Structures are given as structure tokens and as C-alpha cells.
């Protein structure tokens, strides 16, 4: 399975779509890092007047920004990559050739899921590293917080769980519909419904909701593909 995943990733990196997505993400991070060059911070002085101090996002502050502000962009990028990795096989029914070579449906589903998980992890890590480097170039690395490793690990894990939940939900829709357009439309309708649900019930545990979507999507996609007629 490892060699199959490597082959899928290698094929993905040879596509123009992959580099277009990566270029757009880099441009967004670059513009945002450059655009956030300063923000107003009011500091009380002994004279009783507030003094405006100009500061910028440092490398460590950029990591926090990515964990909150850039996840929607990463999500869209991963959805496009999911379409490239899985959508083409399902919509054009190219998976039949793979199954005819002796691979079972379970094995096909597992290696596709593993490939999507690996792609999401690499994509997210790349965005964090790029943001840190650009933030450090523009404004310096800054002072590392005392609890940096703990807080960053939690933020990264939550971000990865969110990206994987979105990717799995979209993949589940692809397995159900075999239609890229229908999957995109349904996915964004579900996103809006989820946002409305959180607005109405803010006390809902978002982490639990994320893992519920992740588990349900993985199970639903597997069942849909297992019982789908060739």
C-alpha cells in the first residue's frame, strides 16, 4: 500500500492543478503576511493618553493566525486535490480497471483514504511552515511562548482533524453520487447548515462535532462504495 500511496502522490505532483493550488496558497499567505505588516495596539502612558504602537505578526504569531484564519483556504485546496485524487476515478469509473487488476474494494478504499490523509497532512504542514518563514522574514521570529509546543500541537491536531473531516465528507459525497458538481454543491450546503447550527446552539462542542463528521463520513463512504454496482 505504501508504494501505491507514493505513486498517487507522485502523479499528483506532476499535474498542473497541484502547482496552481500550491501557488495560490503561497500567494495568499504572502499577501496576508505582507498585508498584516502592522496593527494598532493602544498602550497607556504616564501622561494618561493612549499611545498607538505599531506592531506586526511575527513568525510565531503567524502560526496562530494560520490555525484560525487560513483553514478555509486550506480546506478548499484539499477539496480540489481530493477531486484530482478520487473524483476522476469515480466519475469516469476508472476504478474498474484497478479492481480488475485484483485489488478489492476494501483495499481500494483504504489506500485512497490513506492517500487523502497523507495529502491533507502534507498540505497543512506546508502552510504552517510557509507562514512561519514569511512571518519571520517580514517581522522576525518573535519570542516563543513558554507553552508553545503544547498549544501548537493542540492547534495543529485540531486543524488536521477539521481538514480531514471536510475531506472525508466530500469523499463520502463522491462515493454516494459519483458526481463532482453534486458533491461540491451538497458539501457547501452542509457547511452552511453546520455554521447555522453553531450560531443557534453555540454551546455545542465543535471538536466532538468534527470527530463525529469524520467518523460518519469514513463509514458512510466505505458502505456506499462497497454496495455500489460496477
Name what the model sees in each region.
Residues 1-25:
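Aromatic- and glycine-rich beta-strand/loop motifs that create alpha-glucan
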Residues 5-12, 108-109, 152-157, 225:
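Hydrophobic alpha-helical elements at and bordering transmembrane segments
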Residues 18-21, 98, 108, 182-184:
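Alpha-helical transmembrane segments and their helix-entry boundary regions
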Residues 5, 11-12, 212-230:
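Junction motif at the cytosolic side of a transmembrane helix
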Residues 104-105:
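Short coil/turn motifs that cap or connect alpha-helices
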Residues 22-85, 110-180, 187-188, 195-198, ...:
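Secretory targeting signals
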Residues 33, 87, 195, 219-226:
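Structural signal for the C-terminal ends of transmembrane alpha-helices
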Residues 82-100, 113:
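Transmembrane helix boundary and interhelical loop/hinge segments in multi-pass membrane proteins
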Amino acid at each position: 500500500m505504501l508504494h501505491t500511496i507514493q505513486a498517487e502522490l507522485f502523479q499528483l505532483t506532476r499535474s498542473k492543478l497541484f502547482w496552481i493550488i500550491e501557488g495560490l496558497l503561497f500567494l495568499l499567505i504572502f499577501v496576508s503576511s505582507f498585508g498584516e505588516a502592522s496593527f494598532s495596539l493602544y498602550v497607556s502612558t504616564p501622561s494618561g493618553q493612549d499611545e498607538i504602537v505599531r506592531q506586526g505578526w511575527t513568525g510565531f504569531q503567524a502560526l496562530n493566525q494560520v490555525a484560525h484564519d487560513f483553514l478555509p483556504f486550506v480546506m478548499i485546496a484539499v477539496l480540489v486535490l481530493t477531486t484530482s485524487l478520487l473524483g476522476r476515478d469515480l466519475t469516469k469509473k476508472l476504478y474498474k480497471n484497478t479492481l480488475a487488476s485484483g485489488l478489492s474494494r476494501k483495499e481500494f478504499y483504504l489506500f485512497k483514504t490513506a492517500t487523502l490523509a497523507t495529502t491533507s497532512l502534507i498540505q497543512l504542514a506546508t502552510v504552517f511552515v510557509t507562514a512561519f518563514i514569511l512571518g519571520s522574514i517580514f517581522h522576525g521570529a518573535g519570542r516563543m511562548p513558554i507553552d508553545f509546543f503544547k498549544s501548537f500541537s493542540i492547534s495543529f491536531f485540531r486543524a488536521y482533524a477539521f481538514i480531514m473531516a471536510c475531506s472525508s465528507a466530500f469523499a463520502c459525497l463522491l462515493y454516494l453520487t459519483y458526481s463532482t458538481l453534486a458533491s461540491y454543491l451538497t458539501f457547501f450546503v452542509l457547511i452552511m447548515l453546520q455554521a447555522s447550527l453553531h450560531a443557534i446552539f453555540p454551546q455545542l462542542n465543535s471538536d466532538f462535532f468534527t470527530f463525529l463528521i469524520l467518523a460518519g463520513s469514513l463509514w458512510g463512504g466505505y458502505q456506499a462504495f462497497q454496495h455500489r454496482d460496477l
